[in-house]
Amino acid sequence: MADSMQLAGIVLAGGESRRMGRDKATLPGPRGAATLLEYVVGVLTQRCDPIFVMAAPGQPLPEVSARIIRDEIRGQGPLPATGRGLRAAAEAGARYAFVCAVDMPLLSPELIDDLVHLATETNAEVVLPWDGRSHYLASLYRTDLAERIDRLVAGGARSMRALIDASDAQQIVLPESRFLANVNTEADLRALAQARA
């Protein structure tokens, strides 16, 4: 693990995928991975242990080397799922967790290394990449933020921005932002496939 930090991985896979029209977790994966979920878990496995996949109730998932945690209620957004994942990571002894979306076909372990390095230097509660915009779902979060998330959710918050605004967050400017690309539509998927060809 980078900088010898105990680092968990959390993959948010339970989103509704409205723009895509089908479950992103089961989309074809890059570099020989059968699905996007398998690819993202494979990347996280290189830097994170344990790994948790946050999934919707009843959502079918491919077999992966990760613990599956089901949302209690469908469609609540990423904040409650992140809180449950951070709580599980804290219980497993991790101080930080890399939290990402399942729809990142160019994700790289080097991105995680860059975030861990800044977290080690600053002890920030959140370290997130910036490439003209903040990427909340490709960031490092301290696991002790689970309680704060519970309070935010109890107050009606559902977006990750609410957590960032209530935290000591540090941003890292990335010279190479392609690792942050995500797929939201069939056109995005085709464009990435063509770029890899």
Swiss-Prot record:
Q: What cofactor does this one take? A: Mg(2+)
Q: Which InterPro entries match?
A: MobA-like_NTP_Trfase, Molybde_CF_guanTrfase, Nucleotide-diphossugar_trans
A Gene Ontology annotation in the biological process aspect, one of them, is:
Mo-molybdopterin cofactor biosynthetic process
Q: Which UniProt keywords apply?
A: Cytoplasm, GTP-binding, Magnesium, Metal-binding, Molybdenum cofactor biosynthesis, Nucleotide-binding, Transferase
**Cellular compartments annotated:** Cytoplasm
CDD domains found in the cross-reference section: MobA
Q: Where does GTP bind?
A: L12, A13, G14, K24, D71, D103
Task: State if Manganese is listed as a keyword.
Answer: no
Q: What GO annotations for molecular function exist for this entry?
A: GTP binding; metal ion binding; molybdenum cofactor guanylyltransferase activity
Task: Identify the residues that bind Mg(2+).
Answer: D103
According to its UniProt record, this protein's enzyme class is transferase
Asked if the Swiss-Prot or TrEMBL record annotates the protein with the keyword Cytoplasm, the reply is: yes
Enzyme Commission (EC) number: 2.7.7.77
Catalytic activity, as annotated:
Mo-molybdopterin + GTP + H(+) = Mo-molybdopterin guanine dinucleotide + diphosphate
Q: Which GO terms describe its cellular component?
A: cytoplasm
The protein's matches in NCBIfam families, at most eight in alphabetical order, are given as: PRK00576.1 (NF001855)
Q: What does this protein do?
A: Transfers a GMP moiety from GTP to Mo-molybdopterin (Mo-MPT) cofactor (Moco or molybdenum cofactor) to form Mo-molybdopterin guanine dinucleotide (Mo-MGD) cofactor.
The similarity comment for this entry is: Belongs to the MobA family.
- Record's comment describing the protein's domains: The N-terminal domain determines nucleotide recognition and specific binding, while the C-terminal domain determines the specific binding to the target protein.
Q: Tell me what this protein is called.
A: Probable molybdenum cofactor guanylyltransferase
Task: Report the source organism.
Answer: Mycobacterium avium (strain 104)
Q: What is the lineage of its organism?
A: Bacteria, Bacillati, Actinomycetota, Actinomycetes, Mycobacteriales
Query: Gene name, please?
Result: mobA
